[in-house]
Every structure is written in structure tokens, then in C-alpha cells.
Amino acid sequence: MASKRALVILAKGAEEMETVIPVDVMRRAGIKVTVAGLAGKDPVQCSRDVMICPDTSLEDAKTQGPYDVVVLPGGNLGAQNLSESPMVKEILKEQESRKGLIAAICAGPTALLAHEVGFGCKVTTHPLAKDKMMNGSHYSYSESRVEKDGLILTSRGPGTSFEFALAIVEALVGKDMANQVKAPLVLKD
């Protein structure tokens, strides 16, 4: 069976943990992860001034699709940049139309709202993004740490990054693999 593939879209201002933890956990599960820089291949300054080097540009990564999951990290500025990008809109709309998984964390789900993706789904966000996300009543809201409704998977923030990542792994390659990856991480139950 061919390896599952993930696209993580990295925008300036992304939250570091919400980017790196899902990438790491998915790679541990054997998922081929591409970290694509929204603005190109140059290192990206994240929300806490950590620089992350993308594998490629989003423009180049788009030509390598489709992906089994598209992941949107949070961070206020990062989510705003994702929300304002026509290319992100195109990728999300294609992913939705082909019934591929879309995963977004923290403020990242606000990009779904901006691009009119996943309307009707139950979602969660960082508590400070809830009002923005619920503007227009396009979604129902959950206080769950991770919420999966059909092919839309959302989570709350940096502290839920491992749960978010493991939920992606479970959705793509199964609960057994998620448990195998989780065990050596020494996470609190």
C-alpha cells in the first residue's frame, strides 16, 4: 500500500507547536509529509520567532498533489495569512471536492470560514477564535479538544497538538498505528 501523504501549509506567524508536532507525529506514523511555505521556500518566522524551513513552496507542492490530508496550523497571523491566500482557497476547495481530509488547529479553522469550506460541520477552535468562527452560523461549535466531523478535523490550540496529530494519524492509517506512535511519546493519559 502506498504511503499516505500530508500537506502542511506554513504561513508567516504560524504557531510553532501546531506546525512541528503534527509533522513529527505524522512522520513517525510513516505518512509522507510536505511542509510547504505559503510565501515560498525561504525560512518562515513563526508566532514566537522560531524560524522553520519549509520543504518546498506551496506553489510547487500544489503540483505534487493530491494529498490525503491538508493541515492548517494556527497562530493568529498565520491563520490570517492562510485566510487571505487565493492559493490556499483553491487547495482547500479541491481537497473538499475530492473528499480529502482537512485538519485545522487553533485559529487555523478560521481559514475554513474565510474560504467557505466545511459549512455545516461541527468544529472547535482556540477559545479566542470562537466568536469569529461562529460569525454567520456556518458551523456548529464544540468545546472538545479535538473534533472530527466527516472530513473536517479541528482542534483547540498548542496544548492539544499531540491529540490533533494523533487524530490525523488515526484518520489516515488507523487506530493501531496511532497507538503505536503514541506509546513512546510518554503523553499524559
Curated annotation (Swiss-Prot):
Instruction: State any GO CC term.
Output: mitochondrion
Entries under InterPro entries matching the protein: Class_I_gatase-like, DJ-1, DJ-1/PfpI, Prot/Nucl_acid_deglycase
Q: Name one GO biological process term.
A: guanine deglycation, methylglyoxal removal
Arranged from A to Z, the UniProt key words for this protein are: Acetylation, Autophagy, Cell membrane, Chaperone, Copper, Cytoplasm, DNA damage, DNA repair, Endoplasmic reticulum, Fertilization, Hydrolase, Inflammatory response, Isopeptide bond, Lipoprotein, Membrane, Mitochondrion, Nucleus, Oxidation, Palmitate, Phosphoprotein, Protease, RNA-binding, Stress response, Tumor suppressor, Ubl conjugation, Zymogen
Q: What is its main location?
A: membrane
UniProt cofactor note: Deglycase activity does not require glutathione as a cofactor, however, glycated glutathione constitutes a PARK7 substrate.
Q: What does this protein do?
A: Multifunctional protein with controversial molecular function which plays an important role in cell protection against oxidative stress and cell death acting as oxidative stress sensor and redox-sensitive chaperone and protease. It is involved in neuroprotective mechanisms like the stabilization of NFE2L2 and PINK1 proteins, male fertility as a positive regulator of androgen signaling pathway as well as cell growth and transformation through, for instance, the modulation of NF-kappa-B signaling pathway.
- Give the matching Gene3D superfamilies: 3.40.50.880
- UniProt protein name: Parkinson disease protein 7 homolog
Modified positions (Cysteine sulfinic acid (-SO2H)) in chain numbering: 106
Q: Which GO terms describe its molecular function?
A: copper ion binding; cupric ion binding; cuprous ion binding; cytokine binding; glyoxalase (glycolic acid-forming) activity; kinase binding; L-dopa decarboxylase activator activity; mercury ion binding
